[in-house]
């Protein structure tokens, strides 16, 4: 014998749409597994969802009224009746039906939610709520207390509002880049693993995603690249933003100062005094000969204009390559060398 959907919801076969909704609301709250701990509550909750799924749809209800459960699910009556090619199968997730009806996956948050939002909760109308003295759907809260408060006398429910979701704080990662990547621009691929909501709105799955991070020419250290709402998702939150913050990698030859590039050139005392030509490497792989005809003191700076990093807002323009000289002094001198230096070097 097939299921009696009307009996499951506790309504007559001639019930109208509003009566079906009221019956489902009452029965679903009564047998929701989060509230009802009886062994058969889960199965009863599923039957209630299936009954509502059929009776709330005029086409399904019409077939059910004519052919019963078996005819509804096989596409027609057993004695040659016809209902076209329609075959009904319950989707199997009573929680999805509950979430669709009440507008949220948490069954009871909606009844105790914050009133900060000005939009009324779409699935709940206080005027439609049936509260039987012997079958209060919130009875479990009365027996065990709610937030440490004893339950007072019953009263009609007040207008309720959904809890406003709050976005999680940003998830910040350091992204180390080379000066060559800043000079040329680059794209990095970063794989992240995060939790995402399933279609039922209450369970989550883990999935990987590749984020393509475009690094533009000349971007400064500390620049932030944000991927909105790519963090973990749960039924109660807004996913966090994923933020990458640029950090310069240490370089074998150069240091960065804004759009300028600093290079330390080490020369001998002889080269510093007598002159020399120093080969200066550039960020793009070239070598520039730098003549030094004057005396070079420790800390002397020479500037090669336009050989630095691109300006972030005007990549066709570049900063400078700044050469800082260091002079390597000998560890010891022979007496003869000392005498020669005394004769030829000025006293001041």
Curated annotation (Swiss-Prot):
Alphabetically ordered keywords of this record: Chaperone
Entry-linked PROSITE patterns: DNAJ_1 (PS00636), DNAJ_2 (PS50076)
GO molecular function annotations of the record: protein-folding chaperone binding; unfolded protein binding
Domain J, first and last residues per copy: 4-68
GO cellular component: cytosol; nucleus
Record GO biological process: chaperone cofactor-dependent protein refolding; negative regulation of transcription by RNA polymerase II; response to unfolded protein
Inducing stimuli: Expressed under normal conditions, its expression can further be increased after various stress treatments.
Coiled coil region boundaries: none
The UniProt record lists the keyword Chaperone: yes
PANTHER family: DNAJ HOMOLOG SUBFAMILY B MEMBER 5, DNAJ HOMOLOG SUBFAMILY C MEMBER
Name of the protein in its database record: DnaJ homolog subfamily B member 5
Organism of provenance: Homo sapiens (Human)
